[in-house]
Amino acid sequence: MNTVSSSDQARVQELRQLLQKASYAYYGLDAPLMEDAVYDQLYHELVDLEAQYPQLITPDSPTQRVGERPATQFVSVQHRIPLYSLENAFDRGDMDTWDERWHKLVPNLSQEPGYVTELKIDGSALALTYENGLLVRGTTRGDGTKGEEITQNVRTIRSIPLRLNIEHPPEWLEVRGEAFLGLQVFDQINRDRIQAGEAEFANPRNAAAGTLRQLDSKVVAERKLDFFAYTIHISGPTDDLALPQTQWQALETLKQLGFRVNPNRRQCESLAEVQTYYDDWSLKRLDLPYLTDGVVIKLDNLGVQDELGFTQKFPRWAIAWKYPPEEAATRIEQITVNVGRTGALTPVAEFKPVQLAGTTVSRATLHNRDRISELDIHIGDTVVVRKAGEIIPEVLRVLPELRPAGAQPYQMPTACPSCGQPAVQLETEAVTRCVNASCPAILRGSLIHWVSRGALDIDGLGEKIVGQLTDSQMVQSVADLYELNEDKLMDLDRMGTKLARKIVSAIATSKQQPWHRVLYGLGIRHVGSVNAQLLTENYPTVDALMAVDGDKIATIHGIGPEIAQSVYEWFQTPTNQTLIQRLQSAGLQFEAIVSESTQPQTLSGKTFVITGTLPTLKRDQAKQMIQDAGGKVTGSVSKNTSYVVVGADAGSKLTKAQSLGINQLSEADLLALLQ
């Protein structure tokens, strides 16, 4: 290793500081200090010096954004603070409803909290963690509670500082924001992919998400992702960093720390002003160098935000007001019919591909016979399609003046396209159904549902393998899955020993899934995962559930008459009773391990919040234990919170609990309460 001269050491430090200052001016202030060519020259000088003296390389050096060894996989990590998505509004009526709702939850405000409006960037959400001023982790949104750690890739984004622009940083700080691709960069990426013989990305959002999950950070660096910050969480104030009291102050703090914040934001005193901002940008946004699909509205006062807290999915103090979806005209080329696991025949319009909200769309559901009649659909019709919520394509209307001569109205098939048996439509339903219990399409759909993550979670059994199992008649019921072995699976096309062993192991493991998952996996009409949980809480064994009628089931809070009757009729069907017997013989769980009728309700009436990482219990385990003992677990601290269970790296919930004088429990304290 070369000996470093004092002059070279000083030069490295000077270059580092100058390049960091230039990056902050360029990305944080939109005020470049130097030409790109000058920056590049200084950057390469630093690269050369660090190559000569590797001992001088530091994690926050600008050179460390690129060139790390490709990752082999991404690790799932728990978010310190949940990274929630936002509730959507699609018109002023939705906005008024939201505004009335949060006002009712905080009726005694001394003054209005105000609003901050920001453009909703069409990209991928990131959570950035800084410790003592240094970037230590970058994480995707994931499911909101856990995301994938992609720190190597995040470090390549030039608008994300590796070191905070502050002399006395807090112990930890978390920033949330949106990674995105500018339109020019996106177009260049697609041109490069075409030249390389690769498929184009459908839209900038998909390209950004795919880029962030690249295993090679050099590829990420080449694609020039950008980043706007919009939320900050701070462990505590420091000598030169005060805790923001408003959302507007939080954005200014982010700028001060070196982050790029979207300049097109505004403080508003009323919904009328929010409406003006929304209307102003409805057309101006089309001239922006990046895509935006709406406006994010947040209450400005952070104290009111804390008081309102969160639902299970969204913050109550923020909402995304989406712009109307794009519409396009196209011609229906054919209508195909899909058969679902419940036997429902769903017509799907196949049409000439069109661009909608930045994506290519070539098909859309027509729902059912009534919807087809309402639209008066003919094969060959020119129709207007749009994306409902800018996600699901739908046929909005027909342009009959463009209908070709001789076109015939489309009629739903009278026979199932999968099995050929007669299709029926009950008077009480708009849906046409196949009622053949042996229909291959119904069986295939039932199996795919059974093995899905929310049900029995049988890893390795994807749609292709399920299709082979049903086509070969190796599996004609979900119970047949539990008679499979490696030798049988090896008869399938492209099945290797390793995969066969994995599938057999996953099938065996699925026998330990709890009763509520088994009930959900059975695919009873109208019984989703939440309803399955409610049913098993009230009927902890399958025998208990089979012994009651629909009227009794309907007395469960949250279970209506239609759901109750569907459950009752399913369990009265002889073939379903035989299925239950076979699954019981295979060893699946049809009894709750701990039922509410026998578990002591020692925590009844108590409300808990869990924060940080517990020593031995996973958060879901602790939550379940509290609920089994009659307690309630919420996601935010309020004056109604009885206890806060505190683990390592506890965040702002602990700070708020301390300010409210709420009792704090360790994991050991919680376990003692449960005894």
UniProtKB/Swiss-Prot annotation:
Q: Where is the active site?
A: 120
Q: What function does the entry list? A: DNA ligase that catalyzes the formation of phosphodiester linkages between 5'-phosphoryl and 3'-hydroxyl groups in double-stranded DNA using NAD as a coenzyme and as the energy source for the reaction. It is essential for DNA replication and repair of damaged DNA.
Record key words, sorted? DNA damage, DNA repair, DNA replication, Ligase, Magnesium, Manganese, Metal-binding, NAD, Zinc
Q: What's an example GO BP annotation here? A: DNA replication
Cofactor entry: Mg(2+); Mn(2+)
| Chemical reaction(s) catalysed | NAD(+) + (deoxyribonucleotide)n-3'-hydroxyl + 5'-phospho-(deoxyribonucleotide)m = (deoxyribonucleotide)n+m + AMP + beta-nicotinamide D-nucleotide
Q: What is this protein called?
A: DNA ligase
- Could you tell me which species this protein originates from? Acaryochloris marina (strain MBIC 11017)
Membership in a protein family: Belongs to the NAD-dependent DNA ligase family. LigA subfamily.
BRCT domain location: 598-675
UniProt binding sites for Zn(2+): 416, 419, 434, 439
Matching CDD domains: LIGANc (cd00114)
The cross-references to Pfam families, in alphabetical order and at most eight, read: BRCT (PF00533), DNA_ligase_aden (PF01653), DNA_ligase_OB (PF03120), DNA_ligase_ZBD (PF03119), HHH_2 (PF12826), HHH_5 (PF14520), Nlig-Ia (PF22745)
EC number(s): the record gives: 6.5.1.2
> Which InterPro entries does this UniProt record tie to the protein?
BRCT_dom (IPR001357), BRCT_dom_sf (IPR036420), DisA/LigA_HHH (IPR041663), DNA_ligase (IPR001679), DNA_ligase_AS (IPR018239), DNA_ligase_CS (IPR033136), DNAligase_adenylation (IPR013839), DNAligase_N (IPR013840)
Question: Gene for this protein?
Answer: ligA
Listed GO MF terms: DNA binding; DNA ligase (NAD+) activity; metal ion binding
Disulfide pairs here are none
Per the record, its GO cellular-component terms are: cytosol
Gene3D superfamilies (alphabetical): 5' to 3' exonuclease, C-terminal subdomain, 6.20.10.30, BRCT domain, DNA ligase/mRNA capping enzyme, Helix hairpin bin, Nucleic acid-binding proteins
Query: Which residues participate in NAD(+) binding?
Result: 36-40, 85-86, 118, 141, 178, 298, 322
Q: What superkingdom does the record give?
A: Bacteria
